[in-house]
Structures are given as structure tokens and as C-alpha cells.
Amino acid sequence: MVAPAVRLLAALAPVALLVAAPPLTGCGGAAAPDAHVCAGAGVCGAGYCVAGRCRPADALPSPIDARRVLLPPADLAVLAEHGGDGVPDAVALGREGGGDVVLLLRFAPDFGAGAEIASAFVVLEPTPGAPPAERAVPLEVARILEPWHSNTATWGRQPRLSLPEAAAVVRRRPATPLRIDVTPLVRDWARRRKDDHGIAILAPGSDAVGAAYSMGISQGVGPLLEVYVR
């Protein structure tokens, strides 16, 4: 059975939600193709660490001429190496006791003909009061290449993915919304690629505590797709 909250998310999926995490500020376009993953200030030379990527000062990810759209997932699944079935209220990404975790997200965006995707991010809200990870937690992102459904997806029955790429590093503190840059994947959706079935976020179980994020099942805000559209 799909949890009631997941069914509600599916019903809301076509509707833009202007709530939750505050918008990014800045101007320019998305990250350069060779922009590397970062976790904080002081690691990007002359550039800035914004939304998990090193970016030059003139290429920040929220253009002033773009509109911001927030979409909940049409479907989501949390696949934990040592976890149970179903979507929990919160998931601790990177927690060693839970093993590796794969978060599957499918969205139903409709940006209109001719829309230009300036930048796009998956936004995860931290679980209030959860302890911080003991160390930085690396995350990867991949394109989901075949159909899947939360009713049937399990750790042993995962959809096929593209080659994962480094996407973000979760900092120990402060506990702020995490933005994962998925701009190339969302641009592919706009081109109607037939082998696009959502986004997978992968976290290795390598920390004693992990970084806890809300799935929005009974409280808090679950994952959102934040897109800046021209």
C-alpha cells in the first residue's frame, strides 16, 4: 500500500508550491560543467560554494529574470540496505547502521513549450532536533532509466540507474535545507527523453549518525524539486 501522505503528494504533484526552503539569491546561470562538489566556504578559490557546487561569481544559480517553481514528488521510495519497507517519517542519509540508502524521486513537471531551465535542485529539509552527522556525508545522483513504483521498489528490486555522479556533501552544521544540483537531469526532462523516470539520490552508510531529513509523511516538509524557469 502507498502511504496516505504519498498519495497526497501525487495529487499535488502538478501544482507548484511556493513554500518551504527560501529561494536562492544571485544571478547568472547554472554551474559550469566542470564545477566540483563543495561543502562550505573557503574551498572554491575565487568562486563561491552555492548549492553544493563551486561557481564563479558571475554564474550563481538563481537568475533574477527566472520564476521559481517548487514541486512535490509524484512518487517517492526510500530503499535502505538494512531498512524496512515503506517510506519513514525521516531518513538518516549516510548512517552506517542503516547501510547504503537510495532515495527514488519521480516528479511530474510541466514547464510549458519553450521553457528554459536555468537551474534545478532537489531540496531536502533537515529533521528538527536530529543530531548532526559526525563527519561530512557525500551524496551521489543518478537518472532513473526504467519505470518504477513505490509499491514494488525494494532494496533487492531497484530500477536501473545511470552512472552515479558526485552531487553534494552534507555538512555537519548548521542544519539547513540541502540543495542537490540536478539541472542537467531536469533539462533532459524538458527535452522529453523517453528513458527518464526520475532522480535517484545515493548515500553510502559511512557515518555513525548520518544526516536526518524529513520525508514529509506525518510532519515536516518532504523532498521538493526547486526549478528556476525562464
Language-model segments: residues:
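A short beta-strand element within beta-rich, extracytoplasmic domains
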Residues: 107, 116-130, 225
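Ser/Thr/Pro-rich, low-complexity mucin-like regions
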Residues: 190-210
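Disulfide-braced loops of extracellular cysteine-rich modules
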Residues: 34-48
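Beta-strand-rich interaction/scaffold domains
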Residues: 128-195, 218
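Bacterial signal peptide processing site
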Residues: 28-30
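Flexible, small-residue-rich N-terminal segments that precede or flank a structured functional core
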Residues: 53-110, 149, 205-209, 216-222, ...
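Solvent-exposed, acidic/flexible segments
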Residues: 96-101, 113-118, 134, 192
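Sec-dependent bacterial lipoprotein signal peptides
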Residues: 1-26
